[in-house]
């Protein structure tokens, strides 16, 4: 199996399966001199770990990270950083009934057809369990980006199933299990999930992520565009079926006069581009939104086939998230951090000495600033 590495200069290679002894990753390319301890990583892992509320899987994993290499006396050395998270609460017997069958909507069928072998225990390599190591690696990237550039990466749930979640305040995000930016809607979300869990079904979600403080110039103009790499990274997250940058698909209904982000000496007047123009960061907030499909493993009867191609009825009795989107916010934040970290190093290597006479304008102009009207053609 190939395709387990993300990045060009800041490279992260993950390994491990849902019910194996451990999962982990190797980070290659982290600059030396970054102060780093397990505690710096653990805080992010705790935001993602399972069993934290009744609305997520009840698999109890402490997700305690071990730093095996690349750090000496609390400082990165520039050598590969190996991170390990041991699995402690596997319950493989729950999956015996799907060993010979394929769950609809899951990776079971294509995995079997591609490799001729499949670890059916918890989905094996296709399980969202693997995202824990992405969060661990992302914590390293976030720390460097924060200390070096003051970049802040934050995410929140924008929609749970049919329920949109109006943004009110970042302060509310950390105070509820949904990462919802609106405290008033949390009881409604809880009631919805309680009924969903009783029904045995699952539901999707929409997650928004914002990176503030990203300098102008990161990204390449053709194949390695910053927005292309962000979309690639987000689409690699389990269950993600769509990604938007900035206005995204709403751009279809906009006019050019509405979509184009005008510039003034005081700053940009809007951010429909989501902080990326021509594949290169503009200095505005990088805005990303992703759609997550409903969990494929559900307790309801579904039609499928077995290995011989015979029709069967499948239902799954393991411990699963009825909505994987509930724990996806830290994962999305981590993936954005990894992409930004990689492009930061690439930009520094190629264009770190470039200077222009044009001043960098503010990400958003102060309220009330208007663009100078275009001169009328005679």
From Swiss-Prot:
Gene Ontology cellular component terms for the protein in this record: cytosol
Record InterPro entries: Chorismate_synth, Chorismate_synth_AroC_sf, Chorismate_synthase_CS
UniProt superkingdom: Bacteria
Pathway: Metabolic intermediate biosynthesis; chorismate biosynthesis; chorismate from D-erythrose 4-phosphate and phosphoenolpyruvate: step 7/7
EC numbers: 4.2.3.5
Enzymatic class: lyase
Note accompanying the cofactor annotation: Reduced FMN (FMNH(2)).
Subunit structure: Homotetramer.
Entry function: This reaction introduces a second double bond into the aromatic ring system.
Family: Belongs to the chorismate synthase family.
Protein name: Chorismate synthase
